[in-house]
Amino acid sequence: MRGMKSLVLTLVAALVLPLAWAQSGDWAEETGALTHKDGFVDLYLDAEGGRILVALPAPDEEGVALRAIQATGLTAGLGSNPIGLDRGLANGGEIVAFRKVGDKMVAEIENWTYRASADNPLERKAVRDSFARSFIWSGEILGTGPDGELLVDMSSYLTRDALGVRAALKEHPKGGVYQLSDDLSMPDVAAALAFPDNVEFDAFLTLTSDEPKSEVSATAADARSVTLAQHISLVRLPDEGYTPRLFDPRSGAIDVGFYDFSAPLSGQVGQAFARRFRLEKQDPSVASSPAKEPIVFYVDSGAPAEIRDALIEGASWWAEAFAAAGFPDSYRVEVLPDGAHPLDVRYNVIQWVHRQTRGWSYGGGLTDPRTGEMLKANVILGSQRVRQDRMIFEGLAGASKTGTGAADDPVQIALSRIRQLAAHEVGHTLGFAHNFAASSNDRASVMDYPAPLVWVGQDGNLDFSTAYDTGIGEWDKVSAMWLYRQYPNGTDEDAAGDELLESAWASGLRFVDDPQGRGVGTAHPYSSVWDNGADPVAALLDVMRVRKVALDRFGLDALQTGEPTSRLRAVIVPVYLYHRYQVNAAAKMIGGYDFHYAEAGDANVGGSPVPVDQQRGALSALVATLDPAALDLPDRTLDLLTPPLVTFRGAGAGAEYFAGETGAMFDLLTAADTAASQTLAALLHPERVARLIETERRNRNALSYGDVLREVEDALFGEAETPRQAGILRREQMRYVSTLIDLAANTEATPETVTQTNAYLSALSRRIVSRSRRADPVDVAVRDELSRRITAHLDRPSPPLVPSAPDVEIPPGSPIGAGSAEACWHCDTTLLPR
């Protein structure tokens, strides 16, 4: 038996050893004629065959050959703002594990949202197995190296739709249903790069459709076959020298949330780290010391010189914040070196991106999801924004001021806005959230959305000297100190952070992030977008004065020599609606509720309604924006607003203009309806009305919903000063009733809101009919029609017939594609891949 056993072992060895040598031979055969690049993982590039082979390390006991952070983006994009597939777009990063399963290599996205911090491996495994894993790709193993390395063809991994391009096209109503064409998709072998801590890949993705839609047709050479360049980075996991900082909602930081199922019963399962770069002092024993490795940003060398200089200047403002946090000379901004790939993870890049129309700017980047450590910043700035800003200021100041270099030079004001924009978007990548209350603190943060601060001077002219601020604000320094300050050993960091934030609150600084700042119906009285001033009501009065001066002077001076006069139809929009965002800000005083983000033990816990006298002042200011005299334009202006020529791909027509039903003649009534609808929508937002009702329940002396309705009714159903203004007043009456009917039919409105609104409409119907008996015949007809609409609304069965009047299409103020933030022409945001 022993002899037979020896014979069997000999035969097995004879079979296995040649197989091992054959695998090594396969490796040599596969790679012998290919270009080898040594790096984080070795690459073998097959230029003729269009393949990229990767040598992965020998698998561990769990079969994992490589664990890395993956970032995915677009080297070349679609160019459509609404769809958002821009050059430079990138996701926030994820950890991918390449695992050997049988004879295949499988790529798995690890789920770090759910984790266990315990040392017990079985506890960690229990959490890991409780939530679905994601296998995203598998490929054949081509060969095995002498030390167990595995040779894999990664070409199909690189050409899969890793960024969700098909979904983005499908989800947009003007995108279309596309399929990924395998024949027309391939890796860009020449673009593959290998470095010690990362490898970088580009691939051409071609998506085809038999029924492309308008947004793709407007930007692609052939909308039936759209080719984008997808970029994938694989990055070495950071070492263990980074110390995460727990997120504090009071700090102005950005959170990286997760669930830790190892948390004790006395703790919270839901937790979060603050997102930030790694900074370590050269000398940690002193309060202020340069960092061992500074943070360096690089500006796209493809930006025009004056833009590039403005971007560098604005982004450089953050050096002051880092100095305040104890890191002098630890942050700088330079021009991207020639030949550097903007999506290479070694570079924090500010990209200047071109699109068909103006659009949003983004500040995001690559984050280690395990710790919140920021590894690469990625800022996208749209090139058409600055041109839109210049046009707006030419509408306010006159195009004759362009190029003068004076304080009212539209180009210089627009460049000031670009500096602010660069600082804002870089701020997001550094870990700072929006602070939409900063405008109420003397522009205390670049993380607000800044409206231009323009005044009517004593001479009656517009003063642009303070249009945009320079440098970071006081809140930015506080937030940077909380996020980046490195404390001496033995310091209670939580207590030190609390002391810093409490001192900031004591000085009057406020912080309010997106959920309570963006929406028109939100409650915080000092948190809005594109507003100005510590007193939003006083600021609205100032803005209305600026608007009046600009409209009184509006004419051909708003155009540069040689521009078509029809362009005035585009310029008039932001001037006529110049008050739109300050209206929203003032409306937040009505039914407003002041509060701070706080923790138990803080001195400033709780909230309180806005004092009733301030609410009444806001109501009066808002109702004044409905004055027909404020919404009318003189004939000399109206007759200059001739229609544009519709040219190449519809250029000259579309969303940037007021809608209208009068053909070539400018439709003033629709413009007035548009402006009035902004005010009425803000006043009668379902959330605001619900708060008014609740506040009155708690305090009978509060401003009530009925008070608001009565003041608006008195303004809209009184006598017009002139027959000319009567037409505007009638259109506003229609919009008012329509808004109330829509409010009562809104499924998100509270029962109290619906009940009180319907009761008011019933009474209003009786009042306007009784008044109309002595009125102008046109007034009689309009009021009878309004009464019929109200009766039809009250009598109709469920579901309601809405809308009760056609909606007016409001030209975009925010960059096109704004979505929830719509409601600026001076804008920016981070739609962040966060």
Model-derived features with residue positions:
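Soluble non-cytosolic domains of exported or imported proteins
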Residues: 89, 268, 301, 305-313, ...
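The catalytic-center signature of Zn2+-dependent metalloproteases
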Residues: 335-353, 416-472
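Zn2+-dependent metallopeptidase catalytic core
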Residues: 59-61, 304-330
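Sec-exported extracytoplasmic/periplasmic mature domains
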Residues: 316-327, 355, 427-428, 432, ...
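Auxiliary tRNA-acceptor-end handling modules of aminoacyl-tRNA synthetases
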Residues: 23-303, 321, 335-388, 393-410, ...
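Bacterial N-terminal signal peptides that target proteins for export
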Residues: 1-9
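Bacterial N-terminal signal peptides
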Residues: 9-18
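Conserved catalytic/binding loops enriched for acidic/polar residues
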Residues: 441-834
